[in-house]
Every structure is written in structure tokens, then in C-alpha cells.
Amino acid sequence: MSDTYLTIQDKSEGIYTEKRSKFLAFAHPVETIDEIKDLLTDYKKKYYDARHVCYAYMLGPERTDFRANDDGEPSSTAGKPILGQINSRELTNILVVVIRYFGGVKLGTSGLIVAYREAAAEALSAATVIERTIEETVTFTFPYVMMNSVMRVVKELTPRIVEQKYDETCIITLAIKRSMAPMLEERLNKLAFE
């Protein structure tokens, strides 16, 4: 289980032309299905005159939520090659949309696969890939007299303090790399028995 994942920093674009058909590709960093739906709606409105608006997305640090859509192209000739480019770069939290303007010459199954793959590759090559840290939050409630001990653990393990409330009973919420969360919880819970 990794503490990081790869995604892109900002929107990027690419273009691929084959036998007068033009393939416009756009890659977006995304976090939710709703965000993806909104972007797809926008693209379908903006490029209403395009023959096809095909896409693929990958969501989540574990890369388990994904979809590929051919939007009327022959089965597996558009969405799958786009998704293949996302997979080959091991990216997640990403949407890649490829819009096709038909140029009058049929490309055939293999031609479509190559065109959608290359258009997606162009957009992804133009993107800045970044590494994000996967964090878990830990909330700990303790009496004020334990403050020094708690802060010593915080200093040693260096979690990010998300929220803190200090009174007779204190509450602190910490964010830490996923792999370190069990150790942080264990160290804080041990303090209660000192």
C-alpha cells in the first residue's frame, strides 16, 4: 500500500490528425464523478458539432474506479485506448476527453485505436505529472495535563495539525501519511496508560 499516487497538476491539451479527421484531446485533474459529469456536459455543449466525444477516467489512490466510453465509435476503439494511456502512466484522479471531427475518410478499427491512443498521449505528454501524498486523519481526545506528552509525539512523527481545541479536555485532529497512521494512533493511545 503506497503513500502516494500520480496525477496531473492542471488541464493539458493535445491534437492528432489522421486522414483529415481531427482529434482534440483534453486531460483534467479531477476528484469526483460529479466533476467528471460537469466537464463532459461542458465539452458536449462546446463541441456540439463534433462527431464523437469519447473519454476515459481513473479515480482514487488505489486506481479502482474507472470507465472508458466510446460514444458511438466501434466498441473498444476509443475509450479503451484512452484508458490505456492513463494506465501506462499510472495516473489517477484524471479525465481524458478526446473529441473527433470526422474528415470524410473512414479510419477502420485499427486506425481509430491508433488515433485515439495518440491523441490521448499528446494531451498527457503536455501535462505536468505530480505526486500526491495519501493522508489519514487521527482524532485524539485527552486531558490537558497530557499536553506535553501529546505534543512530543506530534513533534516526533510530524503529522499535520488539522484542528485543535485546548480546554480541560483537549481534542486534536492530525493528518499523516497513510502508512504512519497506525503508529500515530498506537503512540497516542499508549499515552493514556502512562
Residue ranges of predicted features:
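Conserved mixed alpha/beta catalytic, RNA-binding, or beta-rich assembly cores of soluble enzyme
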Residues: 75-88, 112-116
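Short amphipathic alpha-helix segments
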Residues: 141-158
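Terminal, non-globular segments
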Residues: 174, 180-183
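Short glycine-/aliphatic-rich beta-strand segments at the starts of folded cytosolic domains
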Residues: 129-144, 172-174
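Long, charge-dense
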Residues: 117-135
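C-terminal regulatory domains involved in ligand/effector binding and gene-expression control
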Residues: 1-77, 163, 181
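Glycine- and acidic-rich phosphate- and metal-coordinating loops
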Residues: 92-102
